[in-house]
């Protein structure tokens, strides 16, 4: 980087599943626009995760394209995940407290979190991912 006088910025996009060809193009375009906006307005960070960038865009009232709709679809399609997100948010990501609030065994909770992670690419044990999903639920 220093040898060539350039600055690199790396964006770790989300892992998407169950998308048709047209949806994949829309999601890619939305992520590309999100990344471009981030570099233009806040290009001082060199690495940024998908959820952190999405939270930044939501706080700045920027357009996220089809991203919120797709993530919300994953939330709605996953049994109990909306309740899990709310309970995890209330218990500050503490899995034991979340399981107790939901009257669920901790291993069952972990299984549902892993299943949602595989489907949506978002790890709800990560506070940025959890906050993004929580905001999507709050905003309907």
Language-model region placement:
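Cytosolic nucleotide-utilizing catalytic cores of signal-transduction proteins
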Residues: 1-140
């Amino acid at each position: 980087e220093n040898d060539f006088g350039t600055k690199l910025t790396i964006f770790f996009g989300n892992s998407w599943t169950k998308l048709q060809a047209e949806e994949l193009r829309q999601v890619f375009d939305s992520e590309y626009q999100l990344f471009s906006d981030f570099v233009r307005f806040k290009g001082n960070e060199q690495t940024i995760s998908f959820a952190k960038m999405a939270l930044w865009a939501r706080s700045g009232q920027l357009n996220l394209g089809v991203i919120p709709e797709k993530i919300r679809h994953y939330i709605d399609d996953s049994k109990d995940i909306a309740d899990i997100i709310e309970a995890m948010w209330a218990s500050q990501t503490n899995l034991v407290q979340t399981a107790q609030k939901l009257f669920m065994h901790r291993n069952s909770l972990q299984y549902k979190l892993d299943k949602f992670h595989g489907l949506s690419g978002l790890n709800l044990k990560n506070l940025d991912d959890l906050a993004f999903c929580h905001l999507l639920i709050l905003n309907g």
